[in-house]
Amino acid sequence: MAEQPMIEMKNVTKVYDNGTVGLKNINLKINKGEFVVIVGLSGAGKSTLLRAINRLHDISEGDILIAGESITKTKGKNLRLMRRKIGMIFQSFNLVKRSSVLRNVSAGRLAYYPTWKTTFNLFTDEDKQRAYEALQSVGMAEKVYSRADELSGGQQQRVAIARVLTQRPEIILADEPTASLDPKTSRQVMEDLKMLNEKFDMTVVANLHSIELAKEFGHRVIGVRAGEIVYDGKMEDTPQSVFGNIYNGGKGKEED
C-alpha cells in the first residue's frame, strides 16, 4: 500500500485579482520526513506555492490535502486545528520585537488555546519549559530573557525556528529563511532545520535562493518557473545543468 503523502496538491491554480497567474496546474506529493527545497527566480511562484499549503493564500482551482485531509475546504475551528500541524518560518522573522525571546518562542503554543487566552498571552509553566528546551535545541538558551530587538538577524531567525519547534508541527514551511543572512549564519539556520527534520521527523519544505545550500541540505529539489513546476527530482540525481535550465528557461522536468 502506497504511503499517504503529508502534502498533496491536485491541479492547483492561483490567479490573483489583477489577473496575474501565480500558480498553474500544480500537481505535487511530499511524503512525511522529506526535506524538500524549492528553487527558481524571484517572482516564479515559490512563495505563492508555499503559502497556499497553509491557506495564507487561497487557491483559485484544485485541492490541497494535508495528511489526506483537504485544507482547501476546511473552515473555522477545523482550519485552526489543521494549521497546528503546519509551522511557518518567514524571511522577516515575524517576532514581536519588544517582547522577550521566551515570550516569542512560547507563542508557538498559541494554536492550542482558545482565542480569549491567546489575546492575553497566558502561557503555562509547561509551555515555558517547552520554549526553553526549544531554545536549547537551537543554541539560543542564553538569550531567553533578552528582547527580540536586541538580537542579530541570524539570532532572530533561530528564535523563530525555536518557536516553530515549540508548536510541534508535522510540517515546516520555510519561506526564504536565509535570504537576509550572511553565509555563516545561513548555514546555522539550515542546520537547525536539518535538526528538526532528522530529530523530530518533521517534513520540511523550504524556498531557497542559494543553490549551494539547496544542494547541501535538500533531499529533493523542485524547480518552479512562471508558476509551473519544471523540475522535480532527488537532489543526488540532479546535475548542475538542471539549475541552469530552471533559471534560464530550459525544460528539465523529471518523471517518477
From Swiss-Prot:
Gene Ontology molecular-function annotations: ABC-type phosphonate transporter activity; ATP binding; ATP hydrolysis activity
Sorted UniProt keywords: ATP-binding, Cell membrane, Membrane, Nucleotide-binding, Phosphonate transport, Translocase, Transport
Gene Ontology CC terms: plasma membrane
Binding-site residues, ATP: G40, L41, S42, G43, A44, G45, K46, S47
Top-level EC class as recorded in UniProt: translocase
Compartments where located: Cell membrane
EC number, as in UniProt: 7.3.2.2
Family matches, as CDD domains: ABC_PhnC_transporter
SUPFAM superfamilies from the UniProt entry: P-loop containing nucleoside triphosphate hydrolases
Role played: Part of the ABC transporter complex PhnCDE involved in phosphonates import. Responsible for energy coupling to the transport system.
Family stated for the protein in its record: Belongs to the ABC transporter superfamily. Phosphonates importer (TC 3.A.1.9.1) family.
PANTHER family linked: AMINO ACID IMPORT ATP-BINDING PROTEIN, PHOSPHONATES IMPORT ATP-BINDING PROTEIN PHNC
Protein's UniProt name: Phosphonates import ATP-binding protein PhnC
Organism: Lactobacillus delbrueckii subsp. bulgaricus (strain ATCC BAA-365 / Lb-18)
